[in-house]
């Protein structure tokens, strides 16, 4: 009973006012995790202010955070130049942060950790292997029936040996509708019946004199 009275006499501090988890310092490149379904990594964008004399405007200076690379072609959102041996500064920096967690895990859990931690809806998951993956599924270009190109649906996988039409690319000659050629002098002006595949008899037109 006396213990309860002593605890009641203490000043109560709401837990919401206490900073339990201290944020990463601005000069740090440590990867933080965004709260969500996949907990993707993120780097706090550190914005510093240059020291300026009194009375002058301070210019904002964006410091290096790790998501950018020294080479613009090797940015994190671009595909690597050499798919067999890609080198990503941001990926290597992220992998070094999570490498200590992968040492005590099986290979299946390690793969799941990479997919969930380095998740981006635009680019596939970053793997050292040249095989392309999208999430946990291996991406392969398979001929799916009904999903080929509409222009040459019946000629899927067959390259035409002759030059295709300039109006609609890769459109086969029997399916080319009349009036799609660039030369209007070759247009057939006679009426055509698609059901009977016949043309109407030529009508008598007065010849100009």
From Swiss-Prot:
Recorded GO CC terms: axonemal A tubule inner sheath; axonemal microtubule; sperm flagellum
Subcellular location: Cytoplasm, Cytoskeleton, Cilium axoneme; Cytoplasm, Cytoskeleton, Flagellum axoneme
Task performed by this protein: Microtubule inner protein (MIP) part of the dynein-decorated doublet microtubules (DMTs) in cilia axoneme, which is required for motile cilia beating. Located at the center of the tektin bundle where may function to recruit tektins or stabilize the bundle.
Keyword terms, alphabetized: Cell projection, Cilium, Cytoplasm, Cytoskeleton, Flagellum
Gene Ontology BP terms: flagellated sperm motility
Pfam families: TKTI1
InterPro entries: TKTI1
Name of the protein: Tektin bundle-interacting protein 1
Subunit structure: Microtubule inner protein component of sperm flagellar doublet microtubules.
């Amino acid at each position: 009973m006396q213990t309860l009275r002593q605890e009641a006499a203490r000043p109560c501090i709401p837990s919401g006012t206490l900073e339990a988890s201290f944020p990463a310092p601005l000069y740090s490149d440590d990867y933080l995790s965004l709260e969500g379904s996949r907990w993707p990594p993120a780097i706090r964008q550190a914005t510093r202010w240059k020291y300026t004399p009194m009375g002058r405007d301070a210019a904002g200076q964006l410091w290096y955070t790790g998501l950018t690379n020294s080479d613009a072609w090797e940015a994190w959102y671009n595909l690597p130049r050499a798919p067999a041996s890609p080198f990503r500064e941001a990926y290597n920096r992220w992998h070094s942060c999570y490498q200590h967690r992968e040492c005590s895990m099986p290979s299946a859990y390690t793969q799941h950790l990479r997919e969930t931690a380095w998740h981006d809806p635009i680019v596939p998951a970053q793997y050292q292997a040249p095989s392309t993956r999208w999430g946990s599924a291996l991406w392969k270009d398979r001929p799916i029936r009904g999903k080929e190109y509409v222009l040459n649906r019946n000629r899927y996988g067959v390259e035409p040996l002759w030059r295709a039409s300039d109006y609609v690319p890769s459109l086969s000659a029997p399916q080319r509708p009349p009036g799609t050629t660039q030369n209007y002098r070759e247009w057939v002006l006679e009426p055509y019946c698609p059901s009977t595949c016949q043309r109407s008899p030529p009508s008598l037109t007065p010849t100009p004199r």
